[in-house]
Regions:
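N-terminal targeting leaders that direct proteins to extracytoplasmic destinations
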Residues: 1-102
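A broad, structural micro-motif
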Residues: 102-104, 165, 183
Length: 220
């Protein structure tokens, strides 16, 4: 893994690990109602990652705001696209200029050793193999499909440390998928978002564990 040179990050920063897609600066997060169950159902992976992103017309865009409710966190930055993580539908929605682009995703049930990018157990490796199998299968029928590996953390810790850790974990998953399972590098990108998009900004420890997550988002 190549070294990450990180000195200072602004509030809405990210670490680009591999092949960057467009970067959002606003977020709406719909929190899950249940705790993630391991291992990930192969049917869920197949359904989500075989569904291509789509563009729809935004009929009503909420006014820019910053607020927190029991299930939703809204952080808007004027002049920037709004990004929505909807865990009920498992889609990332990017809203800009009257259009909404929906990108299906799966949350990987992978665990890492505390404070590191090293995979913790065999279940994590099995989950990555399941994802690799689906991506390879989809690539045969849709050669242009592309997926982004997103690393996220909880709000616990410093922004700089969380940014570096999320980038390292996204890169770790990227390396396993490309090197161990043969996913073409042209089909993947990787980003670390740190604590930019928490599901539970003021959550307890159990909730913050769900924020320490890695997503595979179909971007094309």
């Amino acid at each position: 893994m190549s070294a990450l040179c990180l000195v200072q990050f602004p509030l809405h920063a990210q670490v680009t690990v591999v092949s960057p897609p467009a970067t959002p600066a606003g977020v709406v997060v719909v929190a899950p109602s249940t705790v993630l169950v391991r291992p990930l159902d192969a049917t869920v992976i197949s359904r989500q990652l075989s569904t291509a992103p789509k563009v729809v017309i935004v009929t009503q865009t909420p006014q820019p705001s910053v607020q927190t409710t029991k299930t939703t966190t809204v952080v808007d930055t004027p002049g920037q696209p709004r990004r929505v993580y909807n865990s009920e539908r498992n889609v990332v929605i990017v809203e800009e200029q009257g259009q909404s682009r929906e990108m299906p995703y799966v949350t990987l049930p992978v665990l890492f050793e505390k404070g590191t990018a090293k995979l913790l157990d065999e279940e994590s490796k099995v989950a990555l193999q399941q994802v690799a199998d689906v991506i390879l299968a989809v690539s045969k029928t849709e050669p242009g499909s592309v997926y982004d590996i997103e690393g996220h953390t909880s709000t616990d810790g410093t922004n700089e440390d969380n940014m570096a850790l999320s980038a390292a974990r996204a890169k770790s998953v990227y390396d396993v998928l490309t090197q161990a399972y043969g996913i073409p590098a042209s089909s993947l990108s990787a980003h670390g978002y740190g604590e930019m998009f928490p599901m539970f900004p003021q959550g307890n420890e159990e909730q913050m564990q769900q924020d320490r997550r890695v997503l595979v988002v179909r971007t094309k």
